[in-house]
Amino acid sequence: VTRDAPNVLLITADQWRADCLSAVGHPLVETRALDVLASEGMLFRNHFAQPSPCGPSRASLLSEMYLMNHRSVYNGTPLDARFANLAREVRAAGLDAVLIGYTDTAVDLRHHAVDDPALTTYASVLPGFRQLIPGSELHYAWGRDLARKGYRLPPRGIGADAFHEWFRSAAVPGGGPTFAPATYPAEDNDTAFTINTAIEFVRHPERRPWFLHTSLLRPHPPFLAPAPYNAMYDADDVPSFVTVGDREAEAAQHPFVAYMMRHHLHKKLLTAELHPDDRAARHQLRATYYYLMREVDDNLGRLFAALRETGDYENTLIIFTTDHGEDMCDHWMLGKLSYFDQSFHIPLIIRPPGSGSQGRRGHRIEAFTESVDVMPTILEACGAAVPLQCDGFALGDFLAGTEPPAWRDAAVWEMDFHEIGSGAPEHEIGMPLDLCCFAAIRDAAYKYVHFPSLPAAFYDLAADPGERRNLADDPRHATIMLAYAQKLLSRRMAHAERSLTGIQLTPHGPIERPRTDRLEPGMS
């Protein structure tokens, strides 16, 4: 990497839905800093995460591999140490891979002693990163900062949710379980603390160009916001929920939907149970989710202002995205473990460095992009080679203002929902452990979801964008559904793990086909 190469700032929020940006017309959420970033760069409207939840999704983002290849299928499933990753690749290119926050990596236990504390958490750091502070979900560094400021902390050893709940003020009558504000002001909260650390880094980097991955916890739970954010939006003004109708009608869509509804709406939200019939509480929960986004955006505005002050703003590749989405009570679900778009459709904003892309700035890219495209985009900007293992493709043509000669016409994603400890899906819906999974393919017209031991799901998105009617059993759609099943199978076959498959040992030594010869992104 030469000194005139750009800096790289990769920002990830956690659990941020694609529709929650004012730049795409959300009626309530205000994201002024991100709107400016989008106006100066490109907003990718059809960007999708590959797996969910956090650990598998970040494994795909940071290794550029589909779930079927990296196989870190759930929070706590080890990520094979043999795979290349973004941190190691940018370090090999001569950059210091700095992390502020977390990567939710479960380490490869084959390379650790049996008593290594790293084997007790899924929140280790991806190998190759130099972590400045841990993520605020672990709260240790932020807790020390609060203590220095004179706050009384909860007892040692308390869990992350309980740590946050310690700072919730008394319930406000009629406000719902997530309305009561934090007892600390906004400038002392975990998001501000993380961004303060990032600002300090960009003001005083050890060398240039630099690489910084800033990983923010919000708007992920706990659903707790300080004043004035806790009352910024009226719960009565939030958009209506996307549902089939009542809970029974929603559950009838598919056995997986019914199972997830049982497990992921009755979940505990800090100290209060969210009862499905408590509409006011659900509205307040959604408003609180929006508060946390506004809070993140305001703090990102401070970070971008600091970059401008240092003179580095124009020489920095800035990427904003997230790990996965959030159902937020649509389809009577909470969290990110459905097959609906709300769990997988996520934001991606990229601001290229310099002024060479003025002609494309402010453009909305409608092509289907995936989380696995982020790593090759960064490596290309750094002048580094993209490893053969990678399933995604650099977005450089889009950023340069040209259309790629070939590009995918659909997005795919996967999820594994087995539970090693409880075995809940095995007991409740009779699914063997290794069959608790699904794969989905979605284009502008249809979505097909395949389960190895449950019926498929199929939606006509043109007629039913809210995914309210599963057409899998409708004989009139059998032919088109089969075509999408074949399309999904073709995509999976084309992307089978191939780190070594393009190499052949010969009497004259190894020969290798370049990655660009191996797979065109237009292949499905």
What are these regions (language model features)?
Residues A478-I503:
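A contiguous, mid-protein "functional segment" used to position or interact
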Residues V449-F451:
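Short beta-strand micro-motifs enriched in acidic
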Residues E497-R515:
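Short, charged, surface-exposed hinge/linker loops at domain edges
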Residues V1-Y446, A456, G466-Q486, R515-S524:
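Formylglycine-dependent sulfatase
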